[in-house]
């Protein structure tokens, strides 16, 4: 009984630490994200940023938008895998898992950069084609959410939708291993990308610097990952994206990120 109570107390302590760390990092990341959004004009593409500067901005933006939604999964992971981990190592494990997780989102910034560059080229060279490009992004993002892959990835990101069987298959799961923590972070990053990557792509037609859409996407992703009806929410949002993609054909101004202003 005493061991059970102590284990529960340790689990609560770990959960609290995870939420404090991730939400604090996200809050700090929102400061430069908001500043950048307010200072830079909403124009097509990467707002003049080259690849290095864009990836730096993208990394900060991902910390702001994604970490609160990752807290439940990381808490679950540490509660299952960290029972025999000394308390002094918990912070180290959080840092290692986050490193692997954020690496995936940083790499995802590469195709986003090139797609944004393409959208800018089309906006200048063929404005009507730019609108079609934006419509295609919205349509693909919406349709993808109805695929089995998206549903599976979301289930792996929401502790209320899955048993997290993929975690328990990991070798030496109850032994502390920096390599395993990095691997787990990468794995969770891939699942998260599979569940939410499409939502990030819609920032291109809506504007990569659109603070409004950043907040909307952040809230949608957070609710998807902490709510027991997250899958239903995903379908509803996806339906809305499909509708917007069709509506944009008649009202191109719905895609401000593809207009020269």
Which sequence ranges carry the predicted segments?
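Alpha-helical transmembrane segments of multi-pass membrane proteins
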Residues: 24-40
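A small-residue-rich subset of transmembrane alpha-helices
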Residues: 87-117, 195-244
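Generic transmembrane alpha-helix signature in multi-pass membrane proteins
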Residues: 60, 184-190, 197-205
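Juxtamembrane boundary at the C-terminal end of a transmembrane helix
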Residues: 246-261
């Amino acid at each position: 009984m005493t061991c059970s109570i102590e284990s529960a107390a340790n689990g609560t302590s770990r959960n609290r630490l995870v939420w404090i760390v991730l939400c604090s990092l996200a809050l700090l990341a929102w400061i430069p994200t908001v500043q950048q959004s307010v200072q830079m004009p909403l124009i097509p593409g990467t707002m003049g940023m080259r690849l290095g500067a864009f990836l730096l901005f993208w990394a900060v933006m991902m910390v702001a938008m994604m970490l609160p939604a990752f807290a439940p999964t990381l808490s679950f992971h540490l509660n299952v895998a960290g029972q025999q981990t000394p308390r002094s190592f918990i912070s180290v494990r959080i840092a290692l898992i986050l490193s692997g997780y954020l690496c995936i989102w940083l790499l995802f910034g590469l195709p986003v950069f090139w797609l944004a560059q393409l959208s800018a080229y089309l906006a200048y060279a063929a404005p009507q084609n730019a609108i079609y490009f934006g419509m295609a992004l919205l349509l693909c993002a919406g349709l993808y959410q109805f695929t089995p892959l998206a549903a599976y990835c979301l289930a792996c990101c929401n502790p209320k939708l899955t048993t997290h069987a993929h975690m328990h298959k990991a070798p030496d799961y109850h032994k502390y291993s920096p390599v395993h923590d990095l691997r787990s972070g990468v794995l969770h990053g891939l699942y998260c990308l599979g569940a939410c990557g499409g939502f990030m792509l819609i920032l291109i037609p809506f504007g990569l610097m659109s603070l409004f859409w950043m907040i909307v996407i952040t809230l949608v992703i957070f609710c998807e990952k902490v709510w027991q009806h997250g899958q239903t929410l995903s379908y509803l949002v996806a339906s809305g994206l499909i509708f917007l993609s069709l509506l944009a054909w008649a009202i191109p101004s719905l895609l401000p990120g593809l207009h020269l202003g």
